[in-house]
Amino acid sequence: MHLQFLGTGAGTPSRERNVTSIALDLHGVRNATWLFDCGEGTQHQILRTPIKPGRIEKIFITHLHGDHLFGLPGLLTSRSMNGCVEPMTLYGPAGIKTFVETSLSLSGSWLTFPLEIIEISAGEVFQDAHFRVTAYPLTHPVECYGYRIDELDKPGALDAQKLAAHGVPAGPHFYQLKQGRSVTLDDGRVINGWDYVGSKIKGRSLAIFGDTSPTAAASELAAGVDIMVHEATLEVAMEEKANGRGHSSTVQAARVAQQSGAKKLIITHLSSRYLHHDCERLLAECRAVFPHTEMAHDFALFPC
């Protein structure tokens, strides 16, 4: 899996950064992409990547501010105009359903694919055989969430040598044994799969924050994650201004990573006031608190 940042700016686009959108490529688990936020111009950014709109199976919106949302109608209708019939699920705060339906209705647009819209509240919003996604409330002028993505633990490796030593022949029953099931052999012996399976392989975990000032939910949202994505709208000298608008400073993002035990912090959602030559200074502010910090830029890739 990997994250690709499609937009890393805050509020308005700049020549260097588009507004917010992040793609999570699930390659290695399944042939699909999840999108987190969809600011204006996201579909233009996608055209410059290998991402296929038809393979975007889920979109998670953190909140309904335009720089996280206004690219959604265009992406949905373009996906439809390209003849896509693969279903999609859209998650977001209350009002997301009205926004999409009104945009489509007023523009005389329609979709060629099934779109399920789920208006979320805090708590688990999705789980299947591979992943669990949980929403956490953040502190912002409008209802806003951060999403924690946990890959479920996988069964450990099957010890084929141990099985052979115990006279268990290879065959289709190896799959059942790897799942921890019991299998009855032709000679009548009952073999318990858990006796031959190694320790579970821990799944990966990510925390993707929406816009927020310091909030109580942050430590649980990001507890022990492999990658934490957090906004750093303004530098530490402008922290009071950032907090007054429901945002965080560089140092505040780094403190969340430090206190939650995250392994890596990626900062994004930078004010358009900052140009390329400012980035090293902002990154240094974070690394002074949390050394394992990276700064996202548009189209940056980070393995998960």
UniProtKB/Swiss-Prot annotation:
GO terms for molecular function: 3'-tRNA processing endoribonuclease activity; exonuclease activity; zinc ion binding. Zn(2+) 1 binds at H63, H65, H140, D211. The active site is at D67. The keyword Nucleus does not apply. Binds 2 Zn(2+) ions. It is an enzyme of class 3 (hydrolase). Its EC number is 3.1.-.-. Homodimer. NCBIfam families: PRK00055.1-1 (NF000800), PRK00055.1-3 (NF000801), RNase_Z (TIGR02651). Zinc phosphodiesterase, which has both exoribonuclease and endoribonuclease activities. This is Ribonuclease BN. It comes from Erwinia tasmaniensis (strain DSM 17950 / CFBP 7177 / CIP 109463 / NCPPB 4357 / Et1/99).
